[in-house]
Amino acid sequence: MAELTISSDEIRSAIANYTSSYSAEASREEVGVVISAADGIAQVSGLPSVMANELLEFPGGVIGVAQNLDTNSIGVVVLGNFESLKEGDEVKRTGEVLSIPVGEEFLGRVINPLGQPIDGMGPITAEEDRVLELQAPSVLQRQPVEEPMQTGIKAIDAMTPIGRGQRQLIIGDRKTGKTAVCIDTILNQKANWESGDKNKQVRCIYVAIGQKGSTIAGVRHTLEQHGALEYTTIVAAPASDAAGFKWLAPFSGAALGQHWMYQGNHVLIIYDDLTKQAEAYRAISLLLRRPPGREAYPGDVFYLHSRLLERAAKLSDDMGAGSMTALPIIETKANDVSAFIPTNVISITDGQVFLESDLFNQGVRPAINVGVSVSRVGGAAQTKGMKKVAGNLRLELAAYRDLQAFAAFASDLDPASKAQLERGERLVELLKQSESSPQPVEYQMVSIFLADQGIFDVVPVEDVRRFEKELHDHLNSATPQVFEQIQGGTALTDESKDALVAAAKDFTPSFRTTEGNNLGTEAPVDPLAADDVNKTELNVSRKTAK
């Protein structure tokens, strides 16, 4: 057995080599400590270099957003299970601000405000991340709103048109059909999506803030049922979520929309609704002990909504000519549009569609109050064809409403007023639409044009909607060239107008009313025909002679 010899020189050399190549691994990081945690807010001490809106990491992978940066503590909005936090827990900086993953893979999915899928359909592979609080496009990066965003709702497309890149407020009491108007707008984009034309396609984002889980599931089912989910993303912050998620949900949707907008695509985003976001932000601000203002809202609640809605824009050609159209929803109480949040958002947006509970209860659905609703920039985006046929529609309806109020007290009306009342009743009936039944712009134009020509005047009010449907079916087969000519909202030519009127007059006598009668071909008798006027004058002269 060989003897083991140990050389002191070898040992010395090995130690020298190891120590010369050794470098001590030292790390330095700021660590804070939780002072208190309650109601979704954590007070943290330490972390002197933390930034506003920086993400902080708590034990268990819980994250929070730094909001209040005081001298001795930080107020953090916890995004996740704050009940697991306790006093003394370590808090670490991440050096990052809040961002979400974005990309085409999000179409057809339901995600939370952090970009995580919650629909049980597996993980999402994102293209990139985008910061939530992204700066809105500057003035030079924008161009005027000139392209129409068709909603498929006659009352909106005809009288309060919306353009791509516009912010149009949908406002009204609860249960007046605000969400239904927005969902119908999403459904109306299906034909554009199936065309495959990038300039026509519209990607849709529905942001549900503080809604019941069953309501969000119902919206998803409606979109899936009508084949609209494939071009729609749902960002959900249900009522059961913490206030922090409801506050951030609209910004998550806007970040996703801006990603597509800057790629040159067209986006429609719906915030349902910003009243609940404002209430969540108020709760957060009060818990952070920020000074309250009017209705206990913090002083920067206007800035909360303005910086969000300014992100909707029509980009210049140099920026890719993409657009993001925003339809924010605001819920009023007792039709009071002069409250704090409604007046704020009205002043920020480019117009509003006001839904009235009284009209809704009368069966006028969508329950749009034409007199109060307005679109400040959409007129330039309205199609030429619709602008021509619907030019007098708003005035006719306004005159009808005034006359209707007067007729309630007047015992006798002159024939002209009676005729105006009867036409107004039929126009109101014509503008009614069933939920989830958007109408292409060509059919809207034909209906409004023929109503202006008096075709509907002989139809009983209760049969107007059925008459319209059957008339469209007849015109489709009798005058297909007209629908081709006005495709996309092109103005009606004189030949098309004559063809429509002739075909409509041919169809009218064959229509069977609810009572089982066919509509007569004879024009209604003027109650003040020449003979009647002479008889009236004769009777007056006899009375005068006596």
Swiss-Prot record:
Residue positions binding ATP: G172, D173, R174, K175, T176, G177, K178, T179
Site annotation Required for activity: residues: S373
Stretches the record annotates as Disordered: 511-546
One Gene Ontology cellular component: proton-transporting ATP synthase complex
Composition bias, Polar residues: 511-520, 536-546
Record has Cell membrane as a keyword: yes
Location relative to the cell: Cell membrane
Signal peptide interval: none
Enzyme Commission designation: 7.1.2.2
Membrane topology: Peripheral membrane protein
Gene Ontology MF annotations: ADP binding; ATP binding; proton-transporting ATP synthase activity, rotational mechanism
UniProt xrefs under HAMAP family: ATP_synth_alpha_bact
Self-association state and partner proteins as the record states: F-type ATPases have 2 components, CF(1) - the catalytic core - and CF(0) - the membrane proton channel. CF(1) has five subunits: alpha(3), beta(3), gamma(1), delta(1), epsilon(1). CF(0) has three main subunits: a(1), b(2) and c(9-12). The alpha and beta chains form an alternating ring which encloses part of the gamma chain. CF(1) is attached to CF(0) by a central stalk formed by the gamma and epsilon chains, while a peripheral stalk is formed by the delta and b chains.
Similarity comment: family membership: Belongs to the ATPase alpha/beta chains family.
Protein name: ATP synthase subunit alpha
Species, as recorded: Corynebacterium aurimucosum (strain ATCC 700975 / DSM 44827 / CIP 107346 / CN-1) (Corynebacterium nigricans)
Origin organism lineage: Bacteria, Bacillati, Actinomycetota, Actinomycetes, Mycobacteriales
